[in-house]
């Protein structure tokens, strides 16, 4: 069995026996023997085999995966693999990913156990030990650096393909421990090196890796950099890959997760609103979240929009959707102005008093029958002018404001189409 592992180094190919060696759940240990050929890394490989054997023995005793000893063995397994990987080509990449996934699962399990012991009220005294996931992330980051630093000109051998494998593991890990600063920094690294590493993305034959990478890059561009075009691009590509597996019931949760973030990007970038009836049939959980928002956008109902924000504030903040959804308010206001303009007969001269009443009705606030009844009437009109000025400055409305006459002058066709075609 050991000879089959050694042959992987001679032939630069990954075989099933080597993968089985790394897998702690595969209950078969290997006896170390001398290789039948010269193997420069023999001492390191010997050490790796011994660690893997001990890892399997420990797991067999504690199959629930909640042992600190198991964690330290898995951590050392990845460290030794890193030392071997530094002098090898990318044939070992999936092996390191396998080891990293295994390490993540053990660390996550131990952190969950520790969190239950600490309790929700335990804030720590500043002397607590690092979490297992943080320790695991540090070693995974070493793997990532090994991948990034490869200067091999042969694309089929270069370790840079590994940045996507290990990078997605780190994305998942940072997201789990809510280290959003580290997650965003990682995305910045990928962004700055994408011309260099981009060609390797198409060479990955594991769609799960591609889905994870594109998803987190979509979140980074769309929700951190407010680049809705790139956010939409990455998330749409993620969803397109996910739909290839829609016949598999277990993928429904993943597709729903992607849609939750894709819909706001589609609205803000393309001005395309989801059709609620098909959405309710196919993704009822997603439709439940966005029905109120979509209705407010389509009708210009500010009261409904505010209710959506109020009812879902905690959820939106937790999912990092809050700021993005707030930016949709001007689209609700635009729809309301358009409806008021139509009710005004499409005249190019639109009194601000009339628009102010439309806003009051839409917000569900008392509507004053006569002008200047309310003591804050001028203030309301000033606030309305600010809203209209913003819409005009963004070319959502073709027109201008006359502050002295309290009117908005528009062109004959003041509302240019904002929807963009979907490019494939």
Curated annotation (Swiss-Prot):
Disulfide bonds: none annotated. It comes from the Eukaryota. Transmembrane segments: none annotated. It is found in: Cytoplasm; Nucleus. Keywords: Cytoplasm, Nucleus, Signalosome. GO terms for molecular function: double-stranded DNA binding; RNA binding. One of its GO terms (cellular component) is cytoplasm. Its main location: cytoplasm. PROSITE patterns: PCI (PS50250). It holds the Pfam family PCI. The keyword Acyltransferase does not apply. Residues 224-415 form the PCI domain. Belongs to the CSN12 family. Component of a COP9 signalosome-like (CSN) complex. Component of the COP9 signalosome (CSN) complex that acts as an regulator of the ubiquitin (Ubl) conjugation pathway by mediating the deneddylation of the cullin subunit of SCF-type E3 ubiquitin-protein ligase complexes. The CSN complex is involved in the regulation of the mating pheromone response. This is COP9 signalosome complex subunit 12. It comes from Kluyveromyces lactis (strain ATCC 8585 / CBS 2359 / DSM 70799 / NBRC 1267 / NRRL Y-1140 / WM37) (Yeast). The lineage of its organism: Eukaryota, Fungi, Dikarya, Ascomycota, Saccharomycotina. The gene is CSN12.
């Amino acid at each position: 069995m050991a000879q089959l592992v050694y042959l992987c180094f001679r032939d630069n190919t990954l075989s099933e026996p080597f993968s089985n060696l790394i897998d702690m759940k595969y209950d078969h240990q290997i006896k170390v023997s001398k290789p039948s050929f010269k193997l420069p890394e023999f001492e390191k490989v010997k050490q790796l085999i011994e660690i893997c054997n001990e890892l399997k023995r420990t797991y067999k005793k504690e199959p629930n995966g909640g042992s600190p000893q198991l964690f330290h063995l898995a951590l050392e397994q990845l460290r030794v693999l890193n030392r071997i990987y530094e002098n090898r080509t990318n044939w070992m990449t999936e092996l390191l990913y396998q080891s990293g996934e295994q390490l993540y699962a053990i660390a996550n399990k131990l952190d969950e156990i520790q969190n239950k012991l600490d309790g929700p009220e335990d804030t720590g005294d500043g002397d607590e030990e690092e979490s297992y996931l943080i320790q695991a992330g540090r070693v995974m980051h070493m793997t990532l650096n090994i991948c990034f630093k490869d200067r091999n000109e042969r694309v089929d051998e270069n370790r840079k393909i590994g940045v996507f494998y290990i990078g997605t593991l780190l994305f998942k890990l940072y997201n789990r421990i809510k280290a959003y600063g580290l997650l965003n920094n990682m995305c910045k690294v990928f962004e700055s090196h994408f011309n260099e590493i981009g060609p390797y993305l198409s060479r990955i034959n594991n769609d799960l890796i591609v889905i994870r990478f594109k998803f987190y890059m979509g979140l980074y561009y769309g929700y951190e950099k407010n680049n809705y075009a790139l956010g939409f691009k990455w998330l749409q590509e993620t969803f397109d890959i996910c739909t290839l597996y829609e016949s598999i019931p277990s993928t429904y949760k993943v597709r729903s997760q992607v849609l939750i973030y894709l819909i706001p990007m589609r609205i803000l970038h393309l001005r395309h609103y989801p059709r609620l009836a098909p959405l309710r049939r196919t993704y009822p959980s997603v439709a439940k979240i966005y029905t109120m928002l979509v209705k407010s956008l389509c009708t210009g109902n500010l009261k409904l929009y505010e209710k959506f924000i109020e009812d879902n504030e905690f959820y939106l903040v937790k999912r990092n959707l809050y700021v993005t959804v707030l930016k949709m308010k001007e689209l609700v206001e635009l729809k309301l102005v358009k409806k008021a303009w139509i009710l005004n007969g499409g005249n190019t001269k639109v009194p601000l008093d009339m628009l102010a009443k439309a806003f009051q009705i839409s917000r569900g606030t008392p509507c004053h029958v006569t002008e200047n009844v309310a003591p804050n009437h001028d203030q309301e009109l000033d606030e309305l002018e600010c809203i209209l000025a913003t819409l005009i400055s963004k070319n959502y409305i073709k027109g201008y404001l006359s502050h002295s006459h309290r009117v908005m002058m528009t062109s004959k066709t003041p509302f240019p189409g904002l929807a963009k075609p979907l490019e494939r």
